[in-house]
Swiss-Prot record:
This is Shikimate kinase 1, chloroplastic. The lineage of its organism: Eukaryota, Viridiplantae, Streptophyta, Embryophyta, Tracheophyta. It comes from the Eukaryota. The gene is SK1. It holds the Pfam family SKI. It catalyses: shikimate + ATP = 3-phosphoshikimate + ADP + H(+).
Amino acid sequence: MEAAITQRIQYPSWVDCRKVECKPQRGSLRYSQQVKVDRRFRGLSLARLQPERRNDQRRAVSPAVSCSDNNSSALLETGSVYPFDEDILKRKAEEVKPYLNGRSMYLVGMMGSGKTTVGKLMSKVLGYTFFDCDTLIEQAMNGTSVAEIFVHHGENFFRGKETDALKKLSSRYQVVVSTGGGAVIRPINWKYMHKGISIWLDVPLEALAHRIAAVGTDSRPLLHDESGDAYSVAFKRLSAIWDERGEAYTNANARVSLENIAAKRGYKNVSDLTPTEIAIEAFEQVLSFLEKEETMEIPDGDL
């Protein structure tokens, strides 16, 4: 389940884009050798394209966090973002879209990892339709919240509804789906998700615990019945959940590590990342997966 988390981040308005010339990228032929050639000449890497930020121009981060009641998304409200990053996101979507051939994408990850927010961004720039599994389940239950479903019907009942939702979505094309944190524990769910491309948002447990502690655990049915301070409760339970699910997340076709993105961009904390930056990396990882997939499918004699 995803709780709607709001993280307000202030950004400097100055960006010197005169040093960088950006041209829209176009999809190339779907042949592995051609892909390799195209990739060689796509210009500067994502990291090198970023305008240099001096220490005194680093974004100021406010810990202000709010939570909605419907648990349908982990929404990081970022306000304005760098137009430069928005351009990169659009260009990456244009680059990936021809290779997708209409295949859908499924975002997986721990609760609070931002699947809904990132998924909405990706679907928008691709022109795909977005669905949140938890929201679909709540609608099927006449508006009953996920937390209430757990209380009145139990987790197994909810997991069954989750599988039903994924089964229906798997027959559709050109959709981006935000799954619940526990969707990965049922092998049948992977069968449905692998009809598209699965993307794992890998967020450090400490960061997740801080997010959840800031909004409280009342809306998290799997974090109930614990005593202690909010962060300790969240981190302890998240660690236990990770022990149960961690290996299952590795079944995803693409992994988006927030720690890796932060390191590449010179941030000290993953909380400095914007959803746009995460979505850009997601497209990069999807493209990498698709290129490897093509190479495996094409006989050596055709290379």
